């Protein structure tokens, strides 16, 4: 099992070398590069990766073009260029609720993972404030909503697929039910049925919403939304109760946010290059009890951190090209032709991501640098190959080693890799015209013939692969005892007879030596 970090840059239309940039997928724990995608650049939040490994896809919205580039894992050049109704600024994918677990844990299934597979829905936001929703397996345009007045900066689905959340430059954040967005085959031909309202409209911010994140709860009642804005605020909402829980006020504008997988803290990237940790729990000094911070619409001002207990500083280090007192690490990261142009520009932490176990923080900035930091020590543990423009997306995913390594004999015919062309007009309401392109997987094994011992052994091996962070699979080999009880008894009897014989000989020898010793003493007397 390995964790792969995917990152991509925004690109610069004024830079002729911008098209030479690569989007990369690299391991967190070792130096292996899993995949690279040529001529890939996207607006902030304008790229999305369906997963890591053979059969997965990268979907990129072309900057300032009504075009969508689709890459296959293991191929550097795009497979498809799909025209769109208008240029998109952000993208989001979601798996179907009934197939999500099958896709993630296919090794435990009685069917093999199909070579052709696509997510369920693709959502995109545009500069005009519209939200588009496509069904990828058919290419049907299910919904177009005029959700905002200005550019949509970010769209995200909840992990369960129940809600779609969008943030915009108009300082609003809207929450939509996914079923409302895709309810086109309900048999009602009235156009007013499409004019539904959002599940929740958030208007608490005063400036543009730059980023948002949803937690991954075990039950939907614990679903929370974290939004950040250029008005220096981090706001936490309960989606089910539609209540604002806590507002954190910081000293700088916030550009990015990520939440701890266990809900212990939130990490925000600021416009001055700092990353602040905002703990959601603390220990009461009077009772020594762990208590939650905030709630009940509290407004909390985050104080400065002079001791740097909750602050990451590495993005603030700006090194000039002719500096001599710098480390080799930062020389490599800042070896660009436009160092002098960027010298007076502030450094923004544009994107944040967190590892599966919540121990490593991955961050990208406006200079194209990407770091992996240890959350406990707040020190940089790894750096990736820098890009020549601001980082627009960082995504972390996990997969087995054999899935990440693409072999030459695992290539699929191009026509079987392509997804359907995305429609530019709304689909009709006739359900009989709804056609899907799906691959029915073949059976991998018969679970009914598997006994408990084999199942337990397989689970033990899967647990070992999950905990193994290297590319070497090692385990202690157990040698079975193939001897029978009668053979063991005979072997023990032979050993006992040999020991008895040796003891008898040793005792007789001792008696002889004792007699000789007595004779010598008598002769001397």
From Swiss-Prot:
Compartments where located: Nucleus
Keywords of this entry: Nucleus, Repeat, Ribosome biogenesis, rRNA processing, WD repeat
WD repeat locations: 105-144, 147-186, 204-247, 326-374
Record carries keyword Cell division: no
GO cellular component: nuclear pre-replicative complex; rixosome complex
Recorded superkingdom: Eukaryota
Keyword presence, Transcription regulation: no
One Gene Ontology term from the biological process aspect of the record: rRNA processing
Pfam entry (one): WD40
Predominant cellular place of this UniProt entry's protein: nucleus
Family from the record: Belongs to the WD repeat IPI3/WDR18 family.
Function in brief: Component of the RIX1 complex required for processing of ITS2 sequences from 35S pre-rRNA.
Subunit structure, as described in the record: Component of the RIX1 complex, composed of IPI1, RIX1/IPI2 and IPI3 in a 1:2:2 stoichiometry. The complex interacts (via RIX1) with MDN1 (via its hexameric AAA ATPase ring) and the pre-60S ribosome particles.
Protein name: Pre-rRNA-processing protein IPI3
Species of provenance: Scheffersomyces stipitis (strain ATCC 58785 / CBS 6054 / NBRC 10063 / NRRL Y-11545) (Yeast)
Lineage: Eukaryota, Fungi, Dikarya, Ascomycota, Saccharomycotina
The gene coding this protein: IPI3
